Curated annotation (Swiss-Prot):
Pfam families for this protein: TFIIA_gamma_C, TFIIA_gamma_N
Subunit structure: TFIIA is a heterodimer composed of the large TOA1 and the small TOA2 subunits.
GO CC list: transcription factor TFIIA complex
GO molecular function, one term: TBP-class protein binding
Subcellular location as annotated: Nucleus
Keyword Coiled coil: no
This protein's record includes keyword Transcription regulation: yes
Function: TFIIA is a component of the transcription machinery of RNA polymerase II and plays an important role in transcriptional activation. TFIIA in a complex with tbp mediates transcriptional activity.
Protein name: Transcription initiation factor IIA subunit 2
Alphabetized UniProt keyword annotations: Nucleus, Transcription, Transcription regulation
Family the entry assigns: Belongs to the TFIIA subunit 2 family.
One GO biological process term: RNA polymerase II preinitiation complex assembly
Length: 127
């Protein structure tokens, strides 16, 4: 990954990713109390985005299949958004065999990876 690469802020504001929300709330409190400058809080959040993205890229090894009814889809600024109703997730590699999880609705946000955005092939040589 290049030194100037930017990372998406998906995990900060999601109401389902509590660690990002808790981090943002804690940093806001520290800024309000005058314990840290806003610039430091921004650096912490940027590192959080980078670390979480890298962790998901390297650490997730399970395969998941999603079935459901595609309700809405859109493409804006190279970011795809899909809303799927009545999704069924079949997760392989979870314990012995596979596990099925269902829900009422999910939102999937898909972006180009750093390599794809730079025009490189995934898995190719890196500088």
């Amino acid at each position: 990954m290049s030194a100037g690469q930017t990372y998406y802020e998906f995990y900060r504001g999601s109401r389902h990713v509590h660690i990002g929300t808790a981090l943002t709330d804690a940093l806001d409190e520290l800024i309000t109390q005058g314990d840290i400058p806003p610039q430091l809080a921004m650096r912490v959040l940027q590192q959080f985005d980078k670390s979480l993205t890298e962790c998901l890229q390297k650490g997730v090894k399970n395969k998941t299949t999603i079935k459901g009814h595609l309700s809405t889809y859109r493409l804006c600024d190279d970011v795809w958004t899909f809303v799927v109703k009545d999704p069924q997730f079949k997760m392989e590699g979870v314990g012995a065999g596979s596990e099925m999880v269902t829900g009422s609705k999910i939102k999937i946000v898909a972006c180009k990876s750093g390599d794809a955005a730079d025009g490189k092939k995934a898995g190719g040589a890196r500088e």
